[in-house]
């Protein structure tokens, strides 16, 4: 039997270590926020913000309304550490697949036991 193992490249390791040094904790939950869901950040206290453009070699989101930052904190009134990715990456932005799922890789490497992904979707109904 061959066991699959999560592999992180050198640049990802630099990114992860940068984030770890700022949050100085192990988040138990990672949440990828979809468009319009950044108000969930208000549920946190003791907040630390890490803009994507400050993380060495990290890609930038190009979608309007995506802040492009990690937001770490504890859920208000608890000691539950959570990290939000406020701004995600899409294949239609012309990115390679490895960059589309980089947020999940980072949450995994930070030690998140649970990962929640969200999105905003809609449809057009012809009248």
Per-range role (PLM):
Residues 2-127:
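Metabolite-binding pocket within alpha/beta catalytic cores that recognizes anionic/polar moieties
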